[in-house]
């Protein structure tokens, strides 16, 4: 060895030392970055200390520090052993002390309250928002249920006080001394007030709110007086009572004091004046003055009260008086076109009593009630005297008429020649009555020869 020179010896020694140094498994030598880090000047030793400690614990401390992670060692094996022991002691201390310190820190954080400076830091954030107010409101809400039982009693007292004040507002200066009478007065006042409100509500039943003014003193009487035929249902207790009162449901539209409103019912706007506010106005239209009170519950009662203005023409002195009371305009045609025609038609003023409640009403039908006394003492005698209303046409248009061809159809002509043959039967001459009803004027001397033959 000495012959080779000192340079060779150093190389051999270095080889020996290098072979001694790494005690780690040979498979890991090439994977570790120790060669690179050693060339950079040992800078990698600081970054790998923790990993070294973990690996040493896993290996149980027998193998010692891995040579691949340590800088190149120039000393002996004894120095390496000493360093290894020191490192183990240090790492055990640091690990144990770290765990203990962590435990103590966690306990101290749990037990130690926040410092005043930390509270000062947090307090401005809390003051910015409305959180303290919410807390106060929550606290107040928590206290409310406990006080509700005490608040409810004053509420009832306040309600009672308000009710008393409302009743007091209905009083005047002279309050009734008797409390019962005062209560009754207040009750009546409230009823009247309700009626007033109802009257205002009923104003909408007609397009013209003034239309039904004064039609009836009771504002409830015309409830539903409307063009709809169903609207009159409440007008009478019997909903059938007004059925057929008029075929046209528009006919009673606005039955009121405006003369234009009744145009279709009567040509003369004066004719129905007084049909309403006065309940006495229709008294003479029926033998029973109560019959038309409230448009009668019997629907048959007004059957003949109809719309044709020609129906009863001539039934009265004023031909316009009963216009529109019958559906058939031919019904009384020719009953007598002359209102004087029935003057004294009967001697008994009781005979026509049923036509009018006032027995004085027909007084003018004849100036002398004795004039035709013998004409028919029995008032039933003229019942059905002629079912045909045309039969009495011209029977006596003028009660004072003398013998005339139209009145004496079977008399001889004025020159004495008999131009008319004798009637042989009633059928040939329906106008002649053979039952003893011939008037003295028909028993003329000119008539005797023809009758005796």
From Swiss-Prot:
sequence repeat positions: 201-210, 211-220, 221-230, 231-240, 241-250, 251-260, 261-270, 271-280, 281-290, 291-300, 301-310, 311-320, 321-330, 331-340, 341-350, 351-360, 361-370, 371-380, 381-390, 391-400
* Endpoints of the signal sequence: none
PTM comment text: Post-translationally modified by JMJD6 lysyl-hydroxylase activity at its Lys-rich domain, which inhibits its self-association and nucleolar localization.
Q: Where in the cell is it found?
A: Nucleus, Nucleolus; Cytoplasm
One GO MF term attached to the UniProt entry? molecular condensate scaffold activity
Keyword terms = Cytoplasm, Nucleus, Repeat
Region annotation (Disordered) maps to 1-152, 225-306, 320-432
Q: Which domain of life is it from?
A: Eukaryota
User: Which protein is depicted?
Assistant: Protein LIAT1
Specify the species.
Homo sapiens
| The encoding gene | LIAT1
């Amino acid at each position: 060895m000495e012959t080779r020179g000192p340079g060779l010896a150093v190389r051999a020694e270095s080889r020996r030392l290098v072979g001694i140094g790494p005690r780690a498994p040979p498979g890991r030598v090439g994977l570790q970055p120790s060669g690179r880090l050693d060339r950079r000047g040992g800078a990698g030793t600081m970054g790998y200390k923790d990993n070294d400690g973990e690996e040493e614990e896993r290996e149980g401390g027998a193998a010692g520090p891995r040579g691949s992670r340590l800088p190149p060692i120039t000393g002996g094996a004894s120095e390496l052993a000493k360093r290894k022991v020191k490192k183990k002691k240090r790492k055990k201390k640091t690990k144990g002390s770290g765990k203990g310190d962590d435990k103590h820190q966690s306990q101290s954080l749990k037990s130690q309250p926040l410092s005043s400076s930390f509270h000062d830091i947090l307090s401005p954030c809390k003051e910015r928002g409305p959180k303290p107010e919410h807390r106060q409101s929550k606290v107040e809400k928590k206290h409310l249920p406990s006080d509700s039982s005490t608040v409810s009693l004053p509420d009832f007292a306040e309600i009672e006080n308000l009710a008393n004040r409302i009743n007091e507002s209905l009083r005047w200066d002279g309050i009734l001394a008797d409390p019962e009478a005062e209560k009754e007065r207040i009750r009546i006042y409230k009823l009247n007030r309700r009626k007033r409100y109802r009257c205002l509500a009923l104003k909408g039943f007609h397009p013209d709110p003034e239309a039904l003014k004064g039609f009836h003193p009771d504002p409830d009487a015309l409830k539903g007086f409307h063009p709809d035929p169903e609207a009159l249902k409440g007008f009478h207790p019997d909903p059938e009572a007004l059925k057929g009162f008029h075929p046209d449901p528009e006919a009673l539209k606005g039955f009121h004091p405006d003369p234009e409103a009744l145009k279709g019912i009567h040509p003369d706007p004066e004719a129905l004046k007084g049909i309403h506010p006065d309940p006495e106005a229709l008294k003479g239209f029926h033998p029973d003055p109560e019959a038309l009170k409230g448009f009668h519950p019997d629907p048959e009662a007004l059957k003949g009260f109809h719309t044709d203005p020609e129906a009863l023409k001539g039934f009265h002195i004023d031909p316009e008086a009963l216009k529109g009371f019958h559906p058939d305009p031919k019904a009384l045609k020719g009953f007598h076109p002359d209102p004087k025609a029935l003057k004294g038609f009967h001697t008994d003023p009781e005979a026509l009593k049923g036509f009018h409640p006032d027995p004085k009403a027909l007084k003018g039908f004849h100036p002398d009630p004795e004039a035709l006394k013998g004409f028919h003492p029995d008032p039933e005698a003229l019942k059905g005297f002629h079912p045909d209303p045309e039969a009495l046409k011209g029977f006596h248009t003028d009660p004072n008429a003398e013998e005339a061809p139209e009145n004496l159809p079977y008399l001889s002509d004025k020159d004495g020649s008999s131009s008319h043959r004798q009637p042989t039967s009633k059928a040939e001459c329906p106008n002649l009555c053979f039952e003893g009803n011939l008037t003295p004027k028909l028993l003329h001397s000119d008539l005797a020869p023809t009758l005796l033959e």
